[in-house]
Amino acid sequence: AVIVHFSSYRTMYIASRKHKENIAEYLLYMWQIEDIIRAYNLDIDHIEESVIRPMGLDEERAHALREWYVSLIDMMRCEGVERSGHLQINRNTLGQLVDLHRRLLSSDKYAEYSAQLYKTLPFIVELRAKGGKAPVGELETCFNALYGVLMLRLHGREISKGTADAVAQISKLLAMLAGYYKLDRDDKLEF
């Protein structure tokens, strides 16, 4: 299952590791980094004081992490996502996952993935009905749901049994997709 425990600790290094190991967790993690940057009003000095310094990193790592945040802040400003939305690098990652999702669904070799999607579809339909926003694709709906629940949990809020069931099923689908993504990236997935 896709389970993410968020922390500001060693964010750049965690992001790099997640990108290699679990692309679904990476995407959720990067969405949280975007929100952390917004919470500090895209102010690198405030981020350095409140996020980077408390980590107690050596000077070289602290500098690298600061530069990483600076580059993300610059991208957010250039792309106009200072208040909401996602960086193009994160939208590209989602796009890659959507492309793989479609390829898996169109192949007879990955019936178990299709079966997992069909188990998840009722939750996706329900989430879309509750969403009230412009309709988004199946995977983005899943990621939005997981991210929303993660934020609720971070703030100590309870979630209903129905929501917990939805998140469990969505997590299974995204974990399977993340596994296929890793295989595809390593040229070990055949269509």
Regions found by a protein language model. Name each.
Residues 1-11:
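Short, Lys/Arg-enriched N-terminal segments with co-localized hydrophobic residues
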Residues 125-191:
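Glycine-rich, aromatic-bearing surface loops/beta-hairpins
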Residues 36-39, 57, 71-82, 99-107, ...:
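Amphipathic alpha-helical interaction surfaces
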Residues 13-84:
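N-terminal interaction modules that seed assembly of large macromolecular complexes
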